[in-house]
A protein has these predicted regions:
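Short beta-strand-to-loop acidic/aromatic patch adjacent to the donor-nucleotide binding site
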Residues: 252-263
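Short, acidic, metal-binding catalytic loop of nucleotide-sugar glycosyltransferases
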Residues: 189-198
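A conserved acidic beta->alpha catalytic loop
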Residues: 205-214, 230-231, 262
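Cell-envelope/extracellular polymer assembly enzymes that use nucleotide-activated donors
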Residues: 169-172, 200
């Protein structure tokens, strides 16, 4: 961190006079943060929250000083970056860091933020680039995103077949349910109508407060097994514990985990199992299509599907995965530890897809009319899901979130602003981006294809807001999922360790 302090001193020497005070405050904050990092493993660690508070206070003053200068948009961005750094350091005051990676988080977050700070500053002072070159770059990036979208739509739109000459393996459908009496009856009617020769259906009641247990029991005569869940143990989220309990109860060679709002076609399982066996896969996730048209849900639809298909995630070792519908080979899932490996993780599907990707045994497919796997979510449910998963997906790191929000704003909102201003390349970028959204929507939500022509800016702005709100909720509040808090303070401070007796 001494190098980090030196970097600020260099900036102070070349900065304008009116920026000297904010940078000096920033330097003081960094020095205090250095002391806090050094205190790890030392008796000073007992005062780490006080040190974090002082450091965050200096960063806050630095950002306010820059805002008060009012000398340009780029400098305001500079101040916003420092403000985000203040928020990140303030996590230490609330004990929101995990003890075993506290030092690493301080260091990596600092470098991410200061990369942005130095980039913004030098681009401003040296005038390395101009707006026209940025717009041209955006049009090129948008073109490549369109190409990736087309490639992935072809890759994940698999023509499935259920022609097999071997005996069908046993399959267990596993459904965790918590306070789902409004939708569970419809789902169980759907599951009990599925045609598959060796099928087991197990539904777990995850400590519901409504009529969920009674509804599950009412289908016992149709072969639905009822499992009563338990209060989450320490270190487990409720859903992950429920999924592990279902896995322990299952007897099938393959297990299919489904959310309650997913509907499976009458003949959908045979093609999925065939695809798993022919590809010798350990994991196959399915992105369900939308069942019905809901105007508001379509306008503010989750941008998650667009990102999964338009971004080259597999190139960076993280193949896309869909959590609502996941099919596993039971033996392989148990071999890696099942859900005990992700006991406190939000979005375990990403861990599993990354793990099985190392063995080239993972795949994802997009549902089609022929496959018939669908879902329907209310707008409020979509928002709740995004708040729950966005910040954990960004490593619960404000710096990573800031970078993601900045990239979204520059790519999508920047392109639209340039197009409205009359830029040809800005218009080209907008056409490419809308085309990507239109293609994805036409596959997963065909009835809303017309909405996808104009809803992209709304989706992006909504996603940016939800990402920031997710961060605020996780770091300084609570995140409730089905009336259960899933956000826990993760660092406990023990000022003085007890002596070990011989």
């Amino acid at each position: 961190m001494l190098l980090e302090a030196v970097m600020i001193v260099v900036l102070m020497n070349i900065a304008e006079t009116n920026l000297q005070l904010p940078l000096l405050l920033f330097l003081f904050g960094t020095i205090v943060l250095c002391i806090s990092a050094v205190s790890l493993g030392h008796r000073l660690f007992a005062f780490h929250r006080w040190l974090f508070g002082v450091s965050s206070f200096f960063y806050l003053l630095a950002s306010i000083a820059i805002f008060l200068l009012n000398i340009g948009l780029v400098y305001d961005i500079f101040g916003a970056i420092i403000l985000f750094h203040a928020v990140n350091v303030a996590r230490g005051v609330y004990g929101r860091y995990r003890a075993h990676y506290l030092r690493n988080k301080i260091s990596t977050t600092w470098w991410k933020l200061n990369f942005l700070i130095v980039t913004v500053y030098y681009l401003t002072e040296a005038k390395v680039i101009n707006s026209q070159s940025v717009i041209i770059a955006l049009s090129v990036v948008s073109f490549f995103l369109l190409l990736i979208t087309i490639r992935n739509l072809i890759k994940y739109r698999v023509q499935l077949s259920n022609n097999m000459d071997v005996d069908w393996p046993t399959l267990s459908i596993l459904v965790p349910a918590r306070n789902e009496d409004h939708a569970l009856n419809e789902m169980l009617i759907n599951l009990t109508s599925i045609e598959y020769p060796k099928l087991e259906i197990i539904v777990l009641d995850d400590c519901s407060h409504d009529k969920t247990p009674e509804i599950i029991n009412s289908y016992a005569h149709k072969g639905v097994r009822f499992v009563r869940g338990k209060t989450p143990a320490e270190g487990w989220t409720g859903k992950n514990q429920a999924l592990q309990c279902l896995l322990d109860e299952a007897s099938g060679e393959y297990v299919l985990f489904c959310d309650v709002d997913v509907r499976i076609g009458k003949d959908s399982l045979s093609p999925l199992v065939t695809h798993m066996m022919k590809g010798k896969l350990s994991m196959l996730s399915v992105v369900p299509a939308r069942r019905t048209f809901d105007f508001m849900a379509s306008v503010f639809a989750s941008i998650q599907e667009l990102f999964m298909i338009s971004l080259p995630l597999s190139t960076f070792g993280q193949p896309p995965a869909s959590g609502p519908c996941m099919l596993f080979k039971t033996e392989d899932l148990v071999q890696i530890g099942g859900f005990s490996m992700v006991s406190d993780m939000v979005g375990p599907e990403f861990f599993f897809s990354r793990t099985f990707n190392r063995r080239h045994k993972v795949s994802m497919i997009l549902s089609s009319r022929e496959l018939g796997i669908t879902t329907r979510k209310k707008l409020s449910s979509i928002f709740d899901t995004r708040i729950r998963v966005l910040y954990p997906a960004l490593q619960r790191d404000p710096a990573t979130l800031l970078i993601a929000v900045t990239v979204l704003a520059v790519t999508y909102i920047g392109s639209l602003t340039a197009a409205i201003s009359g830029s040809f390349f800005g218009a080209v970028a907008v056409v490419f981006l809308i085309s990507s959204n239109l293609l994805v929507t036409s596959v997963l939500n065909p009835s809303a294809w017309l909405v996808s022509v104009f809803n992209l800016p709304i989706m992006v702005l909504t996603e940016m807001w939800l990402a920031i709100y997710s961060m605020i909720s996780y770091e300084f509040g609570t995140v409730r999922w089905k009336k259960r808090n899933i956000c826990y303070i993760s660092l406990e401070t023990i000022p003085r360790l007890p002596k070990i007796k011989d």
